[in-house]
Amino acid sequence: NSSGMCCGTAQNSYNTLASIRVLLADGCVLDTGDAASVTAFRSSHASLLDGLAGLAASVRSDAALAARIRAKYKIKNTTGYSLNALIDFDDPVDILAHLMIGSEGTLGFISQVTYKTVPEYAHKASALVFFHDMETACRAVVGLKSRPVDAVELLDRASLHAVADMAGMPPLLKTLADGVTALLIETRAPSAFELDARVASVLEELQPYPLVETATFTTQALEIERLWQVRKGTFPAVGAVRKPGTTVIIEDVAVAVPMLAACCLDLQKLFAKHGYHEAIIFGHALEGNVHFVFTQDFGIEAEVARYAVFMDEVCGMLVEKYDGSLKAEHGTGRNMAPFVELEWGSDAYQLMW
């Protein structure tokens, strides 16, 4: 259910799914875009569908649990299974189809997906805007969310430093002061006239903030691509300088946008506390979704122990302080599987079994 730079929670796979073809563990193939396949499945798997319908009914009858599920999906969330399917759909075939999203193959093998399309506007403008500190940059994101923006990507000072020596990077990256945080902002429109209006709206939002340099948007395709290479180069940059024998770890968390600044600052404090000095933070600020990347040696027992304590503290902080998502868009995976119940609570967690 990864939605990347622009799709957020409104245009992700869950909300744009038109049909899905899936192979279940018993060998049955269900194609929700084929009426004959659906009819046959309703007959052959009536007990499975009845079970899903019953599970959905039990969730809806529990007001507190249903409210918890709704609240969890107001931000990006792929921790565990897509429990929102149990309250969003009445037809158990639709419930089954949407449970597949983010399930990482544990419920079935997805062989085909048909999506509803969304507009892809030809007119685009991008700007890389530098703020003096993380808190100010994140505060700006709160305001930008109400403006006509399609993407707002956050890059902390460490991530900007990581790509500074790559070919084609803006020279300014090499001279930025400690703490400087960038927002890569993009707006799109159906016409050049409308694009100008949207750029003006974004600049109006940025006007009160003291910036490292004046915010300037470009509409030139090559220049836009150059700016986006700053963002796209962050993850490979960490891998390129890792020590032999270490593994690059990338995590994927989300909090409500007003909490983003405090969350990022807390993450940076934990990096320092546990000695992950090369760690970087970047991500989809418009949705409160950030990735943090660092390297880890799993061949040394003491290093594994350090990592375990670090992850315990990260997960505890994200859940207990921010009620965040431990996996925002990339599925649960091995790293976060032990923490699913911590995030969801026992009642919701039991639904997944």
Show the residue positions of the predicted features.
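Activity-critical C-terminal alpha-helical subdomain
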Residues: 237, 241, 338-353
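C-terminal substrate-recognition/cap domain of FAD-linked oxidoreductases
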Residues: 85-93, 97-309, 317-325, 333-335
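Loop-rich catalytic cores of soluble enzymes, especially ATP-dependent carboxylate-amine ligases
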Residues: 57, 65-66, 333, 339-340, ...
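Short acidic-hydrophobic sequence patches enriched in Asp/Glu that either
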Residues: 12-14, 198, 306-310, 344-351
